[in-house]
Each structure stands twice: as C-alpha cells, then as structure tokens.
C-alpha cells in the first residue's frame, strides 16, 4: 500500500528534490484522505507532516466556510457556523406539524423525523430523540454562565442547538432544542 502510494506523485509544484509543497488541490485531497484513514502520507513533503496536515485542514475549512457563506442565509450561517441562537417562536419549524424529515442545513444528513418532534412550548423545534444514523455530537457548553450540552452535526460540525433533560419521560427524558435555521424540512 505505502509503496504504491509513495510512487504516485500528485504535486504540481515539487521542489528540486521532488518533494511536494502540500499546497496544491490534489496534495490537499491526498493529505486529507490519508488523515481520514489514520495514516501519514508516504510522500515526502517539504514541511513536516504535522505542518502539511494542519495547512490542508485549514485550507479545507476556509473553502467550506466560503461555500457556507455563499449558500446559507445570514441567520443559517450565524447559527450553524458561529453557534448563534435564533429568537424563540421566530424559526420556520418551531410549530411545524407536517410529516417528514429534518436534515442538517449544511450537509443534508438526516437528523430527526416528524415522529420524534413534540411541542415543548419553548419556541424552538423540540425532539425527544435523534435519527438512528444521525450520530449527533454532544459537547459540554459552559458559555453565558450556564451549563448546557451543545449538539452539533457530527458530519459537518454545524451547531444545531442544545439538549436538555426535561423532555417526555416516557420517551427517555431528552429534549433536543434545535434552531430552525440549522435544519431543512423535507
């Protein structure tokens, strides 16, 4: 595996010794692919692997950020990328009653279904559970002098809202309090 890939030069701008800068689009894709499988790329780079990897991650994040800015509305961007919160009773889906699915606005991953939604009276869409494939990330949040648990899309890192322990007890007691701006209804 390593021998095959180490003989595959993908850089468009190698130095005199054939080492890659790690900055071309194909380099970045390759570096991130190796990182995703938990390996170092066997290609020799001009900079140390850690620096090349960090550059690739930063470049990818910058590209994604620009894509999000162009595709999302201001409130969608502020909520999902900057962990903002929309005002209660203002979001598009807080009172949604139709049957369907709720997807991450950034990546389209299925997060919730209408069967999981209930009226908590809080002014944000509330769900007692997440879809079995959602794998929503839960992160301790001590901002604003409070203790909460933030929920994020584990696929694209979009801020969704918070989870609380005041949901329906017969459904597990959880309340996913989700910003309408972070989801799409289909």
For each feature predicted by the language model, list its residue ranges.
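A short Gly-Trp-Pro
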Residues: 60-65, 69-186
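Nucleotide-activated chemistry modules centered on ATP-dependent adenylation/adenylyltransferase
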Residues: 1-59, 67
């Amino acid at each position: 595996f390593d021998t095959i890939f180490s003989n595959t030069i993908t850089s468009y701008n190698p130095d005199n010794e054939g080492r890659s800068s790690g900055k071309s689009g194909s380099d970045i894709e390759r570096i991130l692919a190796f990182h995703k499988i938990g390996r170092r790329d066997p290609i020799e780079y001009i900079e140390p692997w850690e620096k090349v990897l960090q550059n690739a991650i930063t470049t990818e994040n910058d590209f994604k950020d620009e894509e999000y800015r162009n595709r999302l509305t201001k409130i969608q961007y502020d909520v999902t990328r900057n962990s903002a919160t929309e005002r209660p009773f203002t979001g598009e889906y807080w009172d949604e009653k139709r049957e369907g699915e709720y997807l991450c606005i950034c990546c389209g991953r299925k997060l919730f279904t209408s069967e999981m939604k209930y009226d908590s009276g809080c002014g944000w869409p509330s769900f007692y559970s997440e879809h079995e494939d959602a794998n929503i990330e839960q992160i301790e949040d001590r901002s604003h002098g409070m203790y909460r648990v933030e929920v994020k899309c584990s696929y694209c890192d979009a801020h969704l809202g918070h989870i609380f322990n005041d949901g329906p007890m017969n459904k597990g007691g959880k309340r996913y309090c989700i910003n309408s701006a972070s989801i799409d209804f289909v």
